[in-house]
């Protein structure tokens, strides 16, 4: 997943990493007067050094030799915003006069914010401007981009706030977070604040709808030095109303910062929510972002919210060791064209009958905890207790899970605890603005990841604070949303042991202990819940984790891509099982969100690239026959059952990228009406029905023979299962020509095919069987009800 996270930097809207009164980016010279042309240094110059909101501001760019814009003769424009790009008045590449820079000399351009900085950005954004973000670019930025780095210029306000002396008092609550009173008319806020040097901020205040976002000593928080909490109780609350709020914290050394509550269950995002309202995903009647009154992500609370009436309250996974999981991304499951509004929970719920008919018994949702922006895979989390509004409301999430449970389908959640974005309150609280990373004194995060597989900001899982946070979040998700388990992203990174790409997967007892502690929390909250790890470490470590009850992703994509293309090399399936692992310890998959689609490579490369669709789908049916019949947990990536053949490199604009990307992919529900693709779906469904109806035959004790190496290619691959009363044999021909092979059945008599035909076996040790090209035969010792 590591490479995919790199892509996220390009697709999330604007992350909320504004840290007030601080300058990020390249150094900008301090000036005590407006500079002459001769005084300008290479790079950015601005006057005044700190803009005043009610005064004019000027910015010069002097290009140095080697810069993109050095010697450029065309028009130059600025791309500009405020508060670390939280508000940007125009799309990238818009060439309007308002954004045009004045050329004042060769390789020197000037841009002026007039009549004042605030007036230039407009009244709706005039309040709480902390910094101006700017870069200079050419006039052909959409086709031949030339630009500078980002520069950030501090803006000082017209108002000043002088905090009162901090009152030391015992906090009435035991946990950080939001604590309503029994009657809902008051609420106590508690925020943990103690860095690794045992220091804390100079003061903290509450701002929000309850005080019209005014910073005042009346709402200055008290300090409990035993619990290391800032806390305050707000009275006069309407229990039926939602309120937005933030913590405003300051110190002489670090300046001021606004953060939300890390335990809040809903947030408002001034940069992105408006699009959800326009699309009808987020109700216009619900609480909205307080534009013009604050900046950054806003937390929301309600002291007496309506409770969801669960229709199924006692769902249990029947057999976690034999699950078939359907990995699903809401965004790309029902999206049509550019209408992101269709990629929602409501639309996905309408297709649950399709998933149920397929025969899977679990859905694994890609990350849905609040992430930066609206358009994402979700591996860029910022608020873990809030579900992202990009797909729907809290109630709709619960309705989806409830409907799945009604249909006998478990719901697993992909959780991302390896890292968080800079929008996370813990990251913002102790932040190194010059380096754009968490500070050395941050008690939750590493400055740099000790392992090579991380982006954003790396959690330190040796920290008791991090462990408490993760455990609390897991318990919350199991109890509040009734998730049936989790897939943990990038657990290889849950360590403080320094490593490189060659050693990161080596046996690590500290990593085992950390994951075992999280598993204990999951198990204590719901003994039936499952915990799956994206681990990819040495098998000796994976074995220990599996023996403790966890399951681990196991990537079989390469082998099944090769067989899907009709290529025998590197197509060995035998790696699906290993004598060193507990038989049910691996969750095997042919495809996942991270892997290239088998059907795409089949149509683009290999022996079948010019074959008709009917042939290619038959080959994929044969793949499925040697995947879904193997005992142990399995996972299917969405639409693999229809031969989805758009590459993971496919870009949103319809072109092919040079590497994998997280762009939205076309949703091809029309594939379900195409004869041969529907035939592939039907084969999946038939195999899964056979699996679900005969669990004793798909237990590990029933696994008898597995001849699926490269050397078995020409004579046909073979699988045999036997329980005390039932037997199953699969023979597969991945070649593009018919084969005749001798098959071991174990006993003579009638055997039954999936299509209802009967084979009379007369030679139990070597029955001659003809297998058509690109096909399989599945025989059972009992009649199958299809």
Tell where the protein language model's regions lie, with residue ranges:
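Aromatic-rich carbohydrate-binding modules that target alpha-glucans
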Residues: 69-126, 139-153, 186-242, 250-273
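Basic K/R-rich, polyanion-interacting modules in nucleoproteins and related proteins
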Residues: 59, 161-204, 258-321
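Bacterial N-terminal signal peptides
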Residues: 3-11
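Active-site-proximal helices and loops of the catalytic beta/alpha 8
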Residues: 222, 367-369, 377-380, 405-407, ...
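Bacterial Sec-dependent N-terminal signal peptides
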Residues: 10-44, 166, 171
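C-terminal beta-strand-rich structural cap/linker in extracellular carbohydrate-active enzymes
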Residues: 763-786
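Glycine-rich phosphate/pyrophosphate-binding loop
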Residues: 277-329, 572-587, 594-616, 620
């Amino acid at each position: 997943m590591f490479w995919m996270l790199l892509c996220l930097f390009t697709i999330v809207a604007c992350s909320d990493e504004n840290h007030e009164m601080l300058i990020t980016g390249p150094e900008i010279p301090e000036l005590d007067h407006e500079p002459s042309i001769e005084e300008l240094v290479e790079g950015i110059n601005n006057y005044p050094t700190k803009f005043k909101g009610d005064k004019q501001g000027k910015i010069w760019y002097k290009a140095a030799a080697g810069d993109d814009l050095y010697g450029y003769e065309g028009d130059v424009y600025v791309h500009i915003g405020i508060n670390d790009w939280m508000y940007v008045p125009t799309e990238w590449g818009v060439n309007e006069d308002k954004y045009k820079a004045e050329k004042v000399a060769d390789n020197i351009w000037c841009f002026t914010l007039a009549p004042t900085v605030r007036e230039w950005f407009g009244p709706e954004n005039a309040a709480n401007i902390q910094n101006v973000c700017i870069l200079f670019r050419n006039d052909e930025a959409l086709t031949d981009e030339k630009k500078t780095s980002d520069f950030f210029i501090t803006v000082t306000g017209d108002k000043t706030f002088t905090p009162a002396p901090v009152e030391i008092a015992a906090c009435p609550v035991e946990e950080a977070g939001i604590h309503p009173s029994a009657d809902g008319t008051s609420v106590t806020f508690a925020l943990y604040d103690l860095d690794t040097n045992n220091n804390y901020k100079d003061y903290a205040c509450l701002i929000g709808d309850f005080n019209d976002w005014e910073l005042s000593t009346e709402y200055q928080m008290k300090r409990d030095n035993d619990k290391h909490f800032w806390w305050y109780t707000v009275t006069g609350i309407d229990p039926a109303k939602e309120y937005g709020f933030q913590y405003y914290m300051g110190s002489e050394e670090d300046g001021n910062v606004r953060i939300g509550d890390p335990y809040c269950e809903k947030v408002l995002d001034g940069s992105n929510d408006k699009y959800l309202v326009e699309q009808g995903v987020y109700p216009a009647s619900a609480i909205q972002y307080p534009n013009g009154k604050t900046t950054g992500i806003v937390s929301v609370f309600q002291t007496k919210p309506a409770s969801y009436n669960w229709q199924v309250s006692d769902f249990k996974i029947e057999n976690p060791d034999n699950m078939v999981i359907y990995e699903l991304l809401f965004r790309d499951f029902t999206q049509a064209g550019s209408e992101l509004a269709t990629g929602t929970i409501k639309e996905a719920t309408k297709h649950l009958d399709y998933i149920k008919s397929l025969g899977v018994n679990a859905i694994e949702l890609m990350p849905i905890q609040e992430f930066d922006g609206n358009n994402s895979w979700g591996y860029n989390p910022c608020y873990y207790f809030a579900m992202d509004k990009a797909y729907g409301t809290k109630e709709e999430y619960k309705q989806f899970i409830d409907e799945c449970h009604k249909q006998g389908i478990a719901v697993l959640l992909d959780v991302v605890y390896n890292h968080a974005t800079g929008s996370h309150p813990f990251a913002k609280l102790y932040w190194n603005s010059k380096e754009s990373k968490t500070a050395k004194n941050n008690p939750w995060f590493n400055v740099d990841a000790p392992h090579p597989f991380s982006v954003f900001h790396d959690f330190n899982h040796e920290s008791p604070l991090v462990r408490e946070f993760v455990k609390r979040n897991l318990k919350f998700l199991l109890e509040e949303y009734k998730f049936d388990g989790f897939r943990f992203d990038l657990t290889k990174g849950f360590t403080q042991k320094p490593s490189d790409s060659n050693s990161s997967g080596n046996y690590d007892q500290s990593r085992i202990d950390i994951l075992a502690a999280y598993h204990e929390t999951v198990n204590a909250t719901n003994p039936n819940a499952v915990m799956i790890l994206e681990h990819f470490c040495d098998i000796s470590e994976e074995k220990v984790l599996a023996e403790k009850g966890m399951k681990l992703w196991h990537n079989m994509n390469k082998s099944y891509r090769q067989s899907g293309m009709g290529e025998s090399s590197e197509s060995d399936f035998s790696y699906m099982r290993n004598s060193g692992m507990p038989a049910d310890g691996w969750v095997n998959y042919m495809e996942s969100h991270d892997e290239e689609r088998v059907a795409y490579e089949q149509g683009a490369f290999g022996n079948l690239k010019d074959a008709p669709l009917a042939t290619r789908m038959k080959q994929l049916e044969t793949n499925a026959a040697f995947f879904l019949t193997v005992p142990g947990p399995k996972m299917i990536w969405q639409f693999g059952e229809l031969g989805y053949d758009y590459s993971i490199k496919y870009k949103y604009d319809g072109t092919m990228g040079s590497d994998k990307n997280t762009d939205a992919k076309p949703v091809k529900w029309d594939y379900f009406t195409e004869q041969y693709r529907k035939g592939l779906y039907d084969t999946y469904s038939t195999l899964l029905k056979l699996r679900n109806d005969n669990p004793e035959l798909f237990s590990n004790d029933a696994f008898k023979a597995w001849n699926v190496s490269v050397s078995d290619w020409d004579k046909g691959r073979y699988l045999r299962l036997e329980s005390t009363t039932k037997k199953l044999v699969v023979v597969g021909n991945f070649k593009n020509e018919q084969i005749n092979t001798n098959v071991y059945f174990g006993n003579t008599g009638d055997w039954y095919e999936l299509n209802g035909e009967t084979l009379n076996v007369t030679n139990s040790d070597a029955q001659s069987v003809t297998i058509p090209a690109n096909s399989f035969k599945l025989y059972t010792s009992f009649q199958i009800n299809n």
